[in-house]
Amino acid sequence: MKQGLISIIIPSYNEGYNVKLIHESLKKEFKNIHYDYEIFFINDGSVDDTLQQIKDLAATCSRVKYISFSRNFGKEAAILAGFEHVQGEAVIVMDADLQHPTYLLKEFIKGYEEGYDQVIAQRNRKGDSFVRSLLSSMYYKFINKAVEVDLRDGVGDFRLLSRQAVNALLKLSEGNRFSKGLFCWIGFDQKIVFYENVERKNGTSKWSFSSLFNYGMDGVVSFNHKPLRLCFYTGIFILLLSIIYIIATFVKILTNGISVPGYFTIISAVLFLGGVQLLSLGIIGEYIGRIYYETKKRPHYLIKEANIPNKDLPETNELKSMRRLTKMH
């Protein structure tokens, strides 16, 4: 850790056009901030010129550091890689698409100097479609009843964390990471900073409906076992209904005699029970799959190249070329 240094982690996936823009915006903001800073780009397997744009910046600005993954490992892995390699006494996580306004950095640092370990940006839903806003609102109402942490609508990864908070996060070694939940789980003193939603100016969002749905599922499954308990309670409820139905049918037979079998009732019951069983198996399978993933102990990411001094990092292409030339001579 370096005192007086603020580290900024920027996960980047196909953000070639935005890399230099976010760099210029950060440089402008830090002219009025009395901390030194480093900008840490994490290239998450981009297929455009993101890495080259980052390299060009690093060649002219010593404050620019980067790690480039061997493939796309996802934003969670990119954030973790940043936490594991930055040197600052405080760390800011933000996106490369300019939807996280850099003017909030002053508010972040102000909150940090007031003693807060997490200064969190919370945005409104301006610019989002009605359907997305509605689904988001419903999701957060549901998830906060289901999980053991308090997740806020409009709060994402955009925040400042103290070194103490970062070190606490690094102690959490699970393979299936859900940063929103982890940030809440570690606790510490928190301050909320509100801001207006900023629409993306360049490129397109990397979040499709299916990826958002899967991310939401991660939030539900990663932080509680209530879905498993729900399967148990559902089973008890259906068992009680079945007993009541059997007793009612038996009484009806005793009073009215045996009637023609109710095929509709039988088919409905079979389909209903089949659906409940498949849903329960799906929930159980999700948990078992995560346990299986955890037992593999695979690394969260693999680094292809980087410009940070670390003996455990692979050689960059430039260093490889220099080594070959040295051997030839």
Curated annotation (Swiss-Prot):
GO molecular function list: glycosyltransferase activity
Keyword Transmembrane assigned to the entry: answer is yes
Record-linked InterPro entries = Glyco_trans_2-like, Glycosyltransferase_2, Nucleotide-diphossugar_trans
Asked if the record carries the keyword rRNA-binding, the reply is no
Keywords assigned by UniProt, alphabetized:
Cell membrane, Glycosyltransferase, Membrane, Transferase, Transmembrane, Transmembrane helix
The UniProt entry lists membrane topology as:
Multi-pass membrane protein
Q: Which residues cross the membrane?
A: 231-251, 264-284
Per UniProt, the enzyme's principal EC class comes to transferase
Q: Where in the cell is it found?
A: Cell membrane
Sorted alphabetically, the Gene Ontology cellular component annotations on this record are: plasma membrane
| Family named by the database record | Belongs to the glycosyltransferase 2 family. GtrB subfamily.
Protein name, per record? Putative glycosyltransferase CsbB
- Protein species of origin: Bacillus subtilis (strain 168)
Tell me what gene encodes this. csbB
